[in-house]
Amino acid sequence: MIISKFGLGQQIRHKLLGFPGVIIDIDPEYSLETPTWEEISGNDTPRSEPWYHVVMEDNEGQPMHTYLAEAHLMKEELSEHDHPSLNELAEVIQRRAPQLRH
């Protein structure tokens, strides 16, 4: 059984880039068809660990959808950032999370 470190609606931060984000979906392992796993397998990211669909804001505050391995994420400390749109998205997802886990 694979256990994810982060949950739906949780605010996180990209370890390398520092971008803040909100988890909108979780896959127990890498599950995208494009790009293929072979195209990204040059890095040391494990395919069999949880992967997350994350909405992040770049340096200019623009939203972007990303697909990231658990190893690339760290818990966000709420007092560290000021991103109202991410705060709102996190609240909406957390309120609806019980309905999403059917």
From Swiss-Prot:
Pfam families: YccV-like. The keyword Cytoplasm applies. Signal peptide: none annotated. Keywords: Cytoplasm, Stress response. One of its GO terms (biological process) is response to heat. One of its GO terms (molecular function) is DNA binding. The keyword Cytoplasm applies. It is found in: Cytoplasm. One of its GO terms (cellular component) is cytoplasm. Its main location: cytoplasm. InterPro entries: Hemimethylated_DNA-bd_dom (IPR011722), Hemimethylated_DNA-bd_sf (IPR036623), HspQ (IPR022866). Involved in the degradation of certain denaturated proteins, including DnaA, during heat shock stress. Belongs to the HspQ family. This is Heat shock protein HspQ. It comes from Pectobacterium atrosepticum (strain SCRI 1043 / ATCC BAA-672) (Erwinia carotovora subsp. atroseptica). The gene is hspQ.
